[in-house]
């Protein structure tokens, strides 16, 4: 249902009564409420997660049955079963419809009509769909399975029954109809009476009911039984149906139609207004098309709720008038439970916002109940009466809520922010976590894993310490059990306990809280006898099996038989007193820190240390050595100790006393094994004359560490002692102070007054007592801030008295005192009279105590607080000295240098130096006539690390609170009063030269901060800041500003600011800084950092812009830099300064000449005018302030405003983007203004005023991501009207700042225009109904061409138009370009500016749309774009040839004839191809008979192409006349492969008269011979093992392989067949001969009728020349002639033929013919191109194929 509480109850009761009343049944409201309350008790999940559907309702029934079994039937209300059964019958109707529909599909329409005539005519006006039963027994599992089966199996997916099944179904239907016809009337009456006459005090079924129930249940598994609808009572008062049909459709749509006829409008929507006008609209519910709902559900399931298509379907649904109930039903039916919860939440939030926004406009006519469908509008019948405005708001909110659903896979960071608070109990945190997780995902293994992971990750630090050991193995119950009493004391105590038991911390936690595989205590209890887990002491077998014998005579008293440890005697048997009995730590019950009940160490006591424990103290000579080769002597602890991280450094006694052996000194170092257990030993030096006890300084490196008595913890290394003649402070060290040589400190004597000290904790000052006896700092309860968290501890304060109820800070605090700071974790004691500073903080601030007594119990030396009056030490990149020789100086400058050095020596700023560093110095003369000393420190600056700027900007006096008194002081010679660190002085040495080298150079080095050192400003700022820190802490309510050597003091009271001045001067003098008393300014008319403070107004000091020296780029750059510096005080917009900024464009040379333009002169005059009136105000902290965005020309301007301007904020002149919309400039100003407000006042402005209307602002938030980002985290208000002040009225005269001419959707009556442009500079504008406009400019880029085309459209068409382009760049310009500022740096600035002006001149709107190019789709838009695109192409013939060759790799002749290029160009293309020249072959000259026309003689063979794998056997057939080739790749070369190849060849090439092959077995087989005989094809074979007879096909093999290699290198082919087909295509249809004919043309084209040439030829057999005869064909190496007296042609080598030229002389006789000389060398060396086909030579692949030189026939 999704609703709980009283609303859920009202909703359920209303729905229940309505459903039952529609069936003629009535139930009292009290009975319905009682049933609902019982329902919540049985099924608490139902109000929130359940719904009125069959699945949930049956789950309720099962839980009712389970509840009755556990609590008895008397615990169930009497009316529960009847109500549940009736409601289940209603919900089951849909199942019956599905079943009936499935059965009806197998029955013919005539048979179904005949079989159901009686049933349908019985009550034609009361047709409803019923249920299968009404008894409680139908809740059983079998019925559930049947119902689920019916729902899970859609009837559309059932197969149609065959004819026999159809007959069976007809028989079944007839049989059932007959049965139902007889009992229907009786069943109807019985069904109604059963509910109306129900005895509410008796829920037992009557015998008749049980019989009927058993009969119905028996039919559930009967194949012959078909459940038909049960007729129900219909309320006669319902209005008649609007439409009547003879037979309603079967299925869900039919059920809805039937329900509407009966007046049931629960599932009928949307609302349709039937009136003709708004006044007489009558709302009527109409059905939403079921197809639409199915489409929506399918889209959500397949593509997600936020997919574009899904949102389109939602918009289609939203086009109807839907009520809140309709939307909830639609969302619940189509969305997942998690998405539905998100949608419902968002819908409620949007509805609340709508009510708030429209409260004033509609005067409360729209309530939240209307929008949510709650309260009096809970029922659908009441929602139908809602007005159109309300329904529109409902639809708007529903769609917005739908769009807010995140896409699949996008996880919100809700769970990441759900963390346990410091004071929150762990179980409360887990409860919140489970609630959040279960809302996002259903319960199950996945949610449990997520909860467990987050229960660890998001827990606080204390709980994580307890969970960490069992994180992987523990359960959630283990986590909760461990964190029940989580506190720092518990964690520390467990660490102590683990250490005392010798266990790991993780093991101890697992034993205590569980976490193993077995849950809590999976390892079992721990035995106190043997220490093992799994049993207790009484069950210990080791104890029982190892009982020691009875004790003998006591060795202590010698008087009785008992153990020594149990001896209680005070005197021995002789009466002598006995020493006290030593008590082991194990038996001690009063354990304190430092006494650990540790288990016994390996060996006896003292054995591990090697010392005799009965004879302390020890000397150095008693210490043991680990091995003969050990370098150190072992030091052991002589007491049990437990250390924690908070204890810091502790001293461990060793009972070993000095002195060391003569001539040695000692070095104490730790043992490596100690580091493994977390014990860190601090190294120490033992002086040779030290006589006291040697102690070891240790500290814990992890939670807790235990040190057992006798355990070796350190080594003492004895080293040779070299005594030097250094000064001696004391004669002998003796036993005083453990450590090395003493220090010299300032001494403060102890007086009667308490030693109190101020220390800051987290920025808050505390006054406390220095207590050397306090281990830890303790804060008095009265001093502790109430809002600082603390937690109680189990420890108590022990001293002279005891303090209980000790608390401790829940978080570490940062302390600070002067220049020292650190972290402490103090205790908080309510009863302390004042705060105690313990040793944990005194040792950090260097507090020491000096005493002459050698018997101090504390080995400490405590003295006064150290001071440091040096600047911080500089960090250097290298220690390599830098030496630059001093250059010579003139006499005047040399004398000035010597005088200045003398003065600085007297002032203590310089000292003599022997430094290896040296850099030059020089002097300059100031205007006053005085000289100034400077040092060239560039080389030194390069060797130091940059310390950075501590104050990146100037402080503004605007932030000084309004009305406060102000004093400004200035420090005199600040750099020279700050001392350099002694280690750095040597690096700033210099030399004073001597003329003519009369004396050695005098060398000096600076002791103070030198001018020219890059880190001097930073060091100065840090030093002064430390000096005034005490004044800041003392006067925290004052306002103190420090920048370099200027300090501003402010306070509301004049007397207090004077007091601050006195304290400030004292603090500065204490650090050696001097205040210039003559420069102290007080109260009013003050000058500070270039500004003038007069009252509450701040102005810039008077300036005058000079124009007489503005000549170069550098001059103008400085001028504009100064103007920008003072612009925060000036009302100067960027548009007003634009003429000045434009002067900077052009040559980047700094000395390039620039001139003032008239516009720039006006801008400078405006600057001077604004300087004279520039004023800003100081801030009033008690009032809010605003950030106002002002709409000014070119770019917007902003100001911080509080009844006046606090500061002006401007944007740069040039934007980094080419096109920046005006609204984006506004977001940049918002970000910059908020940042500036936080810089000045540490707070966001209270209001932001934007130059847009509310509607425009909302649209910008939705459409532009920059706006939400600019307002991220802003908690104030956004306003849309500027303050009414004359200062801001200039912004009212402004240009367009919001696009209004660009339409976001296509215009209905707009002219259609297509534009395109290409990189060749051609732009095309195709206006529908006109001739295309083509413009060419070879200088244009593709972007420029695209923009030119768009500009042409704007120039040609003034009406509304829809422009389409395939350029993303062009569509991206709109609508921003309408209000954008254009950057002049772009090359297309002129075109963009022209386009912008055309837009501003337009009177009609336009639309710019993007369309994908080269899609080949049908339709006018795609075709129009394709047409425009085709007009932009200008491909040269050479480019086309290159593209074609890159694809096909054809020969040069084909390129020449196809693209009409020269022979040289074609050859050059082939030559430059990286794949073609590699495959040239030299032809073999010879004669090979071939056909004289196509399809006469073929040659066939098989070649192997290994790259084809299993298809490597390539069968090749070539026509010897046309050279037309066909090949197939096959898996073998057997007879079947040859037959299949021949069949395909015939289909591809026709069939020949003769085929020539070699003597391969497949070719000479009987099958081949029979096959060729049937086709009447002659078959001949060549000479065995002589391939020359097959020369043509062999050459074809090479051609095919060469073409395959070319294509394979140039492209990607998926199969061998694909590659082979492309190669055949090139050889047959692309390559050409010298006459421009392809092989296909020669093979299929007509044979030329041109006359054959006559030649003379030599008969090789007769050795004589004959002729003239007809030359049939000729080629490289061969010729075919047809003698006039012969019957067949004769083939001869081509060198034995001569062209016949008809002469007057007679034909030469044979004798003379023999003497005819052979062709000259020139003929013999003719180019192959002159004799062979181009497709065989020009690409380097010459073959033996020839060309019919005259007729164009084959070769």
UniProtKB/Swiss-Prot annotation:
Keyword Magnesium: yes
Keywords: Aspartyl protease, Capsid protein, DNA integration, DNA recombination, DNA-binding, DNA-directed DNA polymerase, Endonuclease, Hydrolase, Lipoprotein, Magnesium, Metal-binding, Multifunctional enzyme, Myristate, Nuclease, Nucleotide-binding, Nucleotidyltransferase, Phosphoprotein, Protease, Repeat, RNA-binding, RNA-directed DNA polymerase, Transferase, Viral genome integration, Viral matrix protein, Viral nucleoprotein, Virion, Virus entry into host cell, Zinc, Zinc-finger
Lipid positions (N-myristoyl glycine): 2
Biased composition (Polar residues): 584-601
Cofactor(s) needed: Mg(2+)
Catalysis: reaction(s): DNA(n) + a 2'-deoxyribonucleoside 5'-triphosphate = DNA(n+1) + diphosphate; Endonucleolytic cleavage to 5'-phosphomonoester; dUTP + H2O = dUMP + diphosphate + H(+)
Zinc finger (CCHC-type) in chain: 525-542, 552-569
Start and end residues of each stretch annotated as Disordered: 154-193, 572-631, 1699-1755
Ranges for domain Peptidase A2: 766-841
Ligand binding (Mg(2+) 2): 1316, 1346, 1366, 1429
Record function comment: Nucleocapsid protein p14: Binds strongly to viral nucleic acids and promote their aggregation. Also destabilizes the nucleic acids duplexes via highly structured zinc-binding motifs.
Protein name: Gag-Pro-Pol polyprotein
Organism this protein belongs to: Mouse mammary tumor virus (strain C3H) (MMTV)
